């Protein structure tokens, strides 16, 4: 199974997956709007185990997450929103939905600095509620009456993304740490450098212990005189 960014060529396939699995359906241009406006945030799950019969075969998309950033958040806080999540019935209980969600959440923080992500779910959709609440850690903020076209209520849920923000910051900090040692005079202490030159000017020997390779048949430390004799 391969999780990758949604491409415009995938749109008819994710629309098919949506029609197969969800009662909330959208026009193709709505998917295109997401793909063009926030290309970093939507992902598809591709069944790579299915061999292609020809080079022109479409990939077998078995799941997708359609996401966006709220353009004018009412609370003034930059955050993302999950518009739609779907996995084909033949590929459920494999952790695909969780992977799609986590990938989208990470992209929201990396690309847009999102502070949290929101979504709506039918109050009768127990499997989805379990995924969002128990697996991913979403919190139920409120119930919106008659949110869906058929009159069913929806839970408005939200997940704080501060842990992802901290993880990204920690990784950035660790990449910036130089654990190596100075080579030659680069990065050396100027005071020690002057002392070394002064000792050489007074005719003192500058000795250093070096390890000689085993290939030469010597396994001890020897002293090497590096001072130039006049």
What are these regions (language model features)?
Residues 8-90, 101-112, 160-166, 181-185, ...:
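Acetyl-CoA-dependent GNAT
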Residues 3-6:
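Charged, low-complexity intrinsically disordered segments
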Residues 98, 110, 115, 123-155:
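Conserved active-site alpha-helix within GNAT-family acetyltransferase domains
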Residues 174-177, 181-184, 188:
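Intrinsically disordered, low-complexity serine/threonine-rich segments
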Residues 166-176:
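Short, charged, solvent-exposed linker or helix-capping segments at domain edges/interfaces
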